[in-house]
Regions:
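N-terminal glycine-rich FAD/FM-binding segment characteristic of electron-transfer flavoproteins
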Residues: 1-366
Length: 366
């Protein structure tokens, strides 16, 4: 077990990203976090390192992490890390952290990351902020963020000048946003949901020059108390909102006839080659499962086209889709806040408008 007090924090330098892989393939959340980590590392003037774990991973996959911003990649390789176990991964990662002492550690808020992050934070006796939607180390950039996302009188508020990681996340069911710091302990740890951070374009020059350090962990079978016997993929296919080019989302406006509203959304999504999303109101009612939810407490998406059907535009929902390239809003309330972020707006009854849209799209394709 390790414990670092305030006197030790100056010894910690660098931004690290845990790069998750499944069956040898690097997950997109890793590239998103490296892109965000690159910004933080630039602001701090430090190195950005990726950490990947597994057994005999493809060297090209490891080098590709440099193409998304990593200066250095620690490749922790062991047959005992072939399959994820909390004990094995936590020990290997914590041992490396205690040796190299990074000041920031970013982990994806995936099922794996939500298990690994808290275990590592507990071992290291440091803090972890979960499900972050915004990260800053530069005070001026943080002030600009507050100016655009809050009603705080930034210019008349005193801010402490430091480079602590300012970790912003939804609180109280998404009704508030809280910024959390960890000033006395290191590393400062944060988990970030997939789709929240923008992934930069791949840079081959970065991949060519990245430094790869192969690490043989001090790990034995006795360190791992759970044995993975078999891995079975879920029979249920979850909707891929984050990777979708088109999202057709439904809100409380379908309450008059939820089944019909969802059916129309599915037909429109099929016509456009997209998938169906939902506001929290829809998933709370059980009309669609939680994997369809878009927003602060759901998924953050950046599709080419986002169609909002009967969605009023609560700030919690808008936070999860406002960076879509084109937003088409259909709502019978002309004062609905969703029109403030919409590229195109249609004031009308979705049950009348959507069938006409579907008909026109199909005719155009014929």
């Amino acid at each position: 077990m390790a414990e670092f007090n305030a006197m030790d924090t100056a010894a910690f330098k660098g931004v690290w990203v845990f790069c998750e892989q499944r069956e040898g393939e690097i997950q997109s959340i890793s590239y998103q976090l490296l892109s965000e980590g690159r910004k933080l590392a630039n602001d701090l003037g430090v190195e950005l390192c990726g950490v990947v774990m597994g057994s005999e991973l493809n060297e090209d996959y490891v080098k590709a992490l440099g193409g998304y911003g990593a200066d250095r990649v620690y490749n922790i390789d062991s047959p005992l890390l072939k399959d994820y176990t909390t004990d094995g991964y936590a020990k290997a990662l914590c041992d490396l952290i205690m040796d190299k002492k990074p000041e920031i550690m970013l982990i994806g808020a995936t099922n794996l990351g939500r298990d690994l992050g808290p275990r590592c934070a507990a071992r290291l006796h440091t803090g972890l902020t979960a499900d972050c939607t915004h990260l800053d180390v530069d005070v001026e950039k943080y002030k600009n963020f507050l100016r655009t996302t809050s009603n705080i009188d930034v210019d008349n508020t005193k801010f402490e000048e430091n480079t602590n990681l300012k970790m912003t996340r939804p609180a109280f069911g998404g009704h508030l946003m809280a910024t959390i710091i960890c000033p006395r302990f290191r590393p400062q740890m944060s988990t970030v949901r997939p789709g929240v951070m923008q992934m930069q374009a791949f840079d081959q020059a970065g991949a060519d020059k990245v430094v790869i350090e192969n690490v043989a962990p001090a790990l034995t079978a006795d360190d791992i108390h759970v044995q993975v016997l078999d891995i079975k993929k879920s029979a249920e296919k979850l909707v891929d909102l984050i990777g979708a080019d088109v999202v057709v989302a439904v809100g409380r406006g379908i309450s008059a006839d939820p089944d019909k509203g969802i059916k129309l959304a599915e037909e429109l999504a099929e016509a456009l080659g997209g998938v169906v999303g939902a506001s929290r109101a829809v998933t709370d009612e059980g009309w669609l499962s939680a994997d369809h939810q878009v927003g602060q407490t759901g998924k953050t998406v950046h599709p080419r086209i986002y169609v909002a059907l009967g969605i009023s535009g609560a700030i919690q929902h808008v936070a999860g889709m406002q960076d879509s390239e084109n937003i088409i809003a259909i709502n019978k309330n002309e004062n609905a806040p969703i029109f403030d972020v919409a590229t195109y707006g249609i004031v009308g009854d979705l049950y009348k408008v959507v069938p006409e849209l579907i008909k026109e799209i199909k005719a155009a394709k014929a």
